[in-house]
């Protein structure tokens, strides 16, 4: 009987919330891990409490140490435990999206940041800000454009404009995207604010928010995020914008958004709202549909054409992958262009290795007990210093 009463009570609460918010869609739950901030646990808790004050259609779950708060808390003691619990709660469906700090994504997944530009106060998505979409720069930026489009559409922009920051490879990216568009995948190209126009963007266009989606490589995007979020504070406290955004990738099914260790209360609050909206609008379904449409327009052959002329001819024997094992140890200092070589060097030496991307750059992941040996092998091979 008590279970029935609880069910009835929950139903009436949901109806009351729906009447109050005007939305009869089910509530989503957004998690946030509270360990890892340079400003302390209370910084992220305050951000969550700020987001909860005007939360529309979502609840917030804190993942971290016990604190005095009215919000739900799932207790963990360390960052590693927090990330494991976050993954467990996401995979079980208990939470629908999560905001966290210092999380490693696999190669192929990158995050799309969201900022407010100072020129006109316009919001802009920066694609991308952490992670590596591909080892080859131009291919990565083409994928980044798709990730930005997916995220912007998931936030309610039906036809987001796309600009390409004027970096090495920008023209090749532009050609690839225009070929994709010509094959039937709809892309609306932005126009530079400068007199000569075009979809390749200048610094002026960054400040003015000339594009809904600004395409860049992740390292440049990461710097841009830090400038946009902390130019008023001197750098140690990121107080503006919505954080580094969700990890997007083909077949990636967790909605995980990234904060910097320097992100302050307002950014944490905004990141939670960002995460809620993505979950409410079903970013995973939108991503699946966009990847399907892009592939139908020849994405894979376009990407293969980009790398055809840049791949080194290889006369080396095929390196066999050693048996898989748990890889929790990390080795940093590897250039993104050398990740594949690093992995093969270790495989050849009989050490199972995977590549990934940490918040500070590319990493090679090996078994904890083999980190020292693997690091020496990579150093001897000239891959790390």
From Swiss-Prot:
It catalyses: acetyl phosphate + [thioredoxin]-disulfide + NH4(+) + H2O = [thioredoxin]-dithiol + glycine + phosphate + H(+); acetyl phosphate + methylamine + [thioredoxin]-disulfide + H2O = sarcosine + [thioredoxin]-dithiol + phosphate + H(+); acetyl phosphate + trimethylamine + [thioredoxin]-disulfide + H2O = glycine betaine + [thioredoxin]-dithiol + phosphate + H(+). GO terms for molecular function: acyltransferase activity, transferring groups other than amino-acyl groups; betaine reductase activity; glycine reductase activity; sarcosine reductase activity. The active site is at 359. Its EC number is 1.21.4.2, 1.21.4.3, 1.21.4.4. It holds the Pfam family FA_synthesis. The keyword Oxidoreductase applies. InterPro entries: FA_synthesis, Gly_reductase_pC_asu. GO terms for biological process: fatty acid biosynthetic process. Keywords: Oxidoreductase. Heterooctamer of four alpha and four beta subunits. Component of the glycine, sarcosine and betaine reductase complexes, together with proteins A and B. In the first step of glycine, betaine and sarcosine reductases, the substrate is bound to component PB via a Schiff base intermediate. Then the PB-activated substrate is nucleophilically attacked by the selenol anion of component PA to transform it to a carboxymethylated selenoether and the respective amine. By action of component PC, acetyl phosphate is formed, leaving component PA in its oxidized state. Finally component PA becomes reduced by the thioredoxin system to start a new catalytic cycle of reductive deamination. This is Glycine/sarcosine/betaine reductase complex component C subunit alpha. It comes from Peptoclostridium acidaminophilum. The lineage of its organism: Bacteria, Bacillati, Bacillota, Clostridia, Peptostreptococcales.
